[in-house]
Amino acid sequence: CMQSCFQDMDHPAFDYPESTGEVPTTPLKMYLPFDEEDIRDKGEWGFLVADNGNAKFAEDGIAGMAYQGAENAYILAKTPSILENNMPTIGDLTVAFWMRTTKNTSAQGLFSIPNSIKFCGNFDIFLENNNSETQAFFKVHIFNQTAKENDERWVEAKIDDIFGSEWVHLAFVYDGNTSTITVYRNGEGVFTKELPDCGKLKFNNVGASLAVGAFQFSTTPSLTSGAGAQTWAKNFPGQLDQFRLYDKVLTATEIQSIYSG
């Protein structure tokens, strides 16, 4: 099993699920619960997940343990071969996770579906600077293949009551049928923006690995030939838990259900 390459030698006794040879059908493409100091994907599709050697774990996750980010830490999730043709034509997208962090003083990468030749990724979520001690300034960047090649879209979402000592659940949902992105905080929709004529998500030059807790250009080596590390861009130093990626539009009810646990 290739995943053993990424085995934590302090915790070698992993039980690997036996492959059934059947292609999964679940829209939950990746699930990282981070329990028992185990960084691996617990979804059915089997992303090959590794950190850069600096990942730590926090004991007090939302349930069990959590990922503890740091300025020199990040996670890479290599897309399994059975999904290599799915990622460029993903269509719809939901990224959902628990987060606990304090106010950022630099841009911090949270998630990227990389573009291997561009400065920015195909789909990026990151924190931008904001003056508030509690309100977070999220930015979402998209390169979509519409009638226009590499149709670039930006979403700026200022969401209240994010920073502090409490865990907060976030979900970023892109609906290709309505060209709309919606952000949920603790199960409630708090932000919506239409991206006219954006349509279903189609990506070019998709990088082999997704980035969690970093920008695509902040990894070593960079996930793109289009840029290397930037002084203004940092890795996410806070905590993450129960990180989920779906290739579907989760409904408000489904997101509320995840939040409620």
Q: What is each model feature region?
A:
Residues 2-4:
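C-terminal motif of bacterial Sec signal peptides marking the signal peptidase cleavage site
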Residues 6-72, 256-261:
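Extracytoplasmic low-complexity segments
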Residues 97, 166-174, 183:
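Short tryptophan-centered beta-strand motifs in secreted/extracellular beta-sheet-rich domains
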Residues 29-38, 94-103, 230-260:
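Extracellular, beta-strand-rich glycan-interacting domains
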